[in-house]
Each structure stands twice: as structure tokens, then as C-alpha cells.
């Protein structure tokens, strides 16, 4: 009932947004027929996706999604965009949900936006425009955002942390025509900035002048020996090793047979070691020298870094997972932030809290069923054996 009322409440909002927005792609995985829109790659032996809900789902229908089902496998699964599109002078807004129900240890959870694609040949070498979503392996817990530009896949110079629990989380990307971007986790902004600043789309605006030469009188030694520091006259009077003054000749020592007895040598506590002058700040120090900066002749601005160079024609998951069980759902691509927000909110409002409540109940139940200590467990085992 609550789920029905939620949908009835959000329906007018979705209709109002839809009047002024363009939805390029939407997938909710509500039933088996949704899988007809997706293609399993045959490029090699990939792991299979299956339609299912989570064991700690918040809604019987909303909780369904496509889940990775085989451990230690690569996955390649894609769907065609009904009408390929470009984002010229429009925002690109991508949203989807990820639920690492298996408590993932190493694996990807990101989605790709691709140009024209033969889904049966889809693999890790297939060209894509954007790769976006969580990536977890070992200590790595980050949100990936990679752009393809001029034949290169550009890595983000930021690494915001992704969610790493077993609950459902939404990820949203907004790319705007002014070459800015925003990344959201559960509709909370975790990063934003300028495309040119945060990826190596373009050469640097300035470079070091190759003709600039360090002056011969430039002083870049910050610390020097104190010229006023003088070695004491008695510094070297004491040797490094001396006979042990506490040593005595053993009573059984026979000089005719054993030779002349000599005291063993020990470190001299008065030995001062190598003398070094005191170090001081160089009064003539000018700082670290660096060539002056000049305008880079190879730099050319591009006010369309945000733009897909080829129409977006497909979406896909190209992943590796050691432990399977990740559920993907609620995929949407639009030119409207409001539409994506309304779509995700309608499907996730209250779901995460329900999942948390179910997780707490499960944990409490497991704690109640567990023996108080290992000794009780061992006693029970002994009684069974008797």
C-alpha cells in the first residue's frame, strides 16, 4: 500500500517534468520482458546476469534488477538506446542504482555510454564515451568517471569515495554545456568542477620556456656550512677504540704458551667522531629556480568538451567481479536533472531505510541464534557425541 501511494503521489510530478524534458533511456527491470532489451556479449565467455530482487530489498518490485551471478567472471551486457542522441547545448544527466549485496571485495559497478554498438561483440576494448560508477577492490573505494576524447580514455584526477555497504545507492552524473560537471551519491553532491581542470582533455595553457636558462650566479643552496664554525683543537685527541680498562688477564693465561695478553678493545666514550661544521640558512639563497612560464603554442581551447563526439547509441556494463551478486537497477539518461531526481526519488524513497531495518533485524536474529561463547558450543558438541 505504501509503495502504491508513493507512486500515486509522485505521478503528477513526473508528468510535469516530462513535459519539458527528454528521456533518452530508461530501464527499471520490472519483469522478465525487460531482459529482451539487453544483449549478452559473445565476444568471450562472460558471466551471466539474472533478474532478481535482493534478499534485503525494500520493495518487492522496485527491488528487482539485473544481478551478476557468477564469481570470478568478466561481464559484458548492453542495451540499445531507442533513439541515439547527442547532448549539443543540453545537459547530460545519468542516474542508476547499485546494490553490492554480496559485500563486494573486488569488482566494478560502473555503467558505460557507448556509440553505435554490436552488443554481441561488446568487450573491454569497445569504444565508449563515458564510464561512470563505483569501483571497489582492496583499499580502493572510489567513484570512477572516465571520458573518451580524441582517441584517449581520460582518468579523473579526483577519487571521491563510493558507498561500500550492502544497501541500495543511487549515483548521478550531470554534465553541462558550460563544461562543468557534478557527481552525486544518494543525491548528495560529492564532487563538482570544470572538465578542463579535472581531466587532461587539453594540453596545459602554459609551459616552461625551453629557452629560459638558469643564471650562473643563481644561488639555490638553501642550507650551507657555517663559515664561522671552527673545529676544536682537541677534537681528534681521542681515538675511536681503546683497551677496556676493566679487563684483567685471566688467571690461567700462560704467556709462554698463549703469548702476550692484551686487553680487548672497546668503543671510546670520549671519541667525538667526524667533525662537521654547523649548518645555517644561506643568506644568499634565492629559492628553487624554475624556467619562466610561457603560453603553450599547442594549446587550443575547446568549449565543447562536454559534447559526445558520436551519438550515444547504447548503454552497457563491462565489469570484472571476484564475488558476484551486485544488483543494478533504475537506469535513466535525460537532459533534465529534475526528471532524473524525480525518477530516482520515486523508486528509492524509503527503500534504503527499509533495507537498513531488515539488516538490523537480521543481525539481531543472528546474534540471538549464536552461542554465548565457544565453551557452550563445545559442551553442546560433547553432549551430542555422548
Locate each region found by the language model.
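Glycan-recognition/cleft segments
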Residues: 51-58, 112-150, 157
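Short, aromatic/His-centered strand-loop micro-motif at the edge of beta-sheets
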Residues: 147-172
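Short surface loop/edge beta-strand patches of beta-sandwich-type extracellular domains
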Residues: 70-89, 156-160
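A carbohydrate-recognition surface predominantly in extracellular/luminal proteins
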Residues: 87-102, 331
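Short, solvent-exposed beta-strand-to-loop segments that form ligand-recognition rims
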Residues: 188-309
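Beta-strand acidic-aromatic groove motif in beta-rich domains, primarily in extracellular
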Residues: 104-114, 182-185
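Extracellular glycan-recognition surfaces and repeat-rich motifs
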Residues: 33-65, 126-131
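Localized edge beta-strand/strand-to-loop motifs within extracellular or lumenal beta-rich domains
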Residues: 167-186
Amino acid at each position: 500500500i505504501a509503495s502504491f501511494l508513493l507512486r500515486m503521489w509522485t505521478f503528477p510530478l513526473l508528468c510535469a517534468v516530462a513535459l519539458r524534458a527528454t528521456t533518452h533511456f530508461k530501464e527499471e527491470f520490472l519483469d522478465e520482458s525487460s531482459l529482451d532489451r539487453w544483449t549478452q556479449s559473445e565476444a568471450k565467455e562472460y558471466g551471466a546476469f539474472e533478474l532478481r530482487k535482493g534478499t534485503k530489498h525494500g520493495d518487492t518490485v522496485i527491488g528487482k534488477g539485473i544481478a551478476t551471478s557468477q564469481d570470478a567472471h568478466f561481464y559484458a551486457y548492453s542495451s540499445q538506446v531507442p533513439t541515439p542522441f547527442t547532448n549539443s547545448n543540453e545537459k547530460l544527466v545519468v542516474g542508476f542504482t547499485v546494490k553490492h549485496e554480496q559485500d563486494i571485495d573486488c569488482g566494478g559497478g560502473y555503467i558505460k555510454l557507448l556509440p553505435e554498438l554490436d552488443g554481441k561483440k561488446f568487450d573491454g576494448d569497445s569504444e565508449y564515451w563515458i564510464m561512470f560508477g563505483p569501483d571497489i577492490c582492496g583499499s580502493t573505494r572510489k567513484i570512477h568517471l572516465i571520458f573518451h576524447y580524441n582517441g584517449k580514455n581520460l582518468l579523473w584526477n579526483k577519487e571521491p569515495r563510493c558507498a561500500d555497504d550492502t544497501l541500495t545507492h543511487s549515483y548521478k552524473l550531470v554534465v553541462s554545456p558550460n563544461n562543468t560537471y557534478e557527481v552525486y551519491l544518494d543525491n548528495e553532491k560529492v564532487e563538482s568542477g570544470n572538465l578542463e581542470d579535472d581531466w587532461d582533455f587539453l594540453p596545459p595553457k602554459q609551459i616552461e620556456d625551453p629557452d629560459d636558462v638558469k643564471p650562473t650566479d643563481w644561488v639555490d643552496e638553501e642550507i650551507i656550512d657555517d663559515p664561522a664554525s671552527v673545529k676544536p683543537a682537541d677534537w681528534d685527541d681521542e681515538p675511536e677504540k681503546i683497551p677496556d680498562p676493566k679487563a684483567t688477564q685471566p688467571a690461567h693465561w700462560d704467556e709462554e704458551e698463549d703469548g702476550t695478553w692484551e686487553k680487548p678493545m672497546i668503543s671510546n666514550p670520549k671519541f667525538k667522531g667526524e667533525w662537521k661544521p654547523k649548518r645555517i640558512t644561506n643568506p644568499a639563497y634565492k629559492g628553487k629556480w624554475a624556467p619562466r612560464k610561457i603560453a603553450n603554442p599547442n594549446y587550443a581551447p575547446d568549449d565543447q568538451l562536454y559534447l559526445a563526439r558520436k551519438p550515444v547509441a547504447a548503454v552497457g556494463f563491462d565489469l570484472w567481479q571476484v564475488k558476484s551478486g551486485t544488483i543494478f537497477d533504475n537506469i535513466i539518461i535525460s537532459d533534465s536533472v529534475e526528471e532524473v531526481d524525480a525518477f530516482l526519488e520515486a523508486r528509492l524513497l524509503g527503500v534504503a531505510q527499509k533495507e537498513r531495518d531488515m539488516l538490523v533485524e537480521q543481525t539481531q536474529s543472528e546474534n540471538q541464534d549464536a552461542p554465548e561463547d565457544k565453551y557452550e558450543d563445545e559442551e553442546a558438541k560433547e553432549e551430542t557425541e555422548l
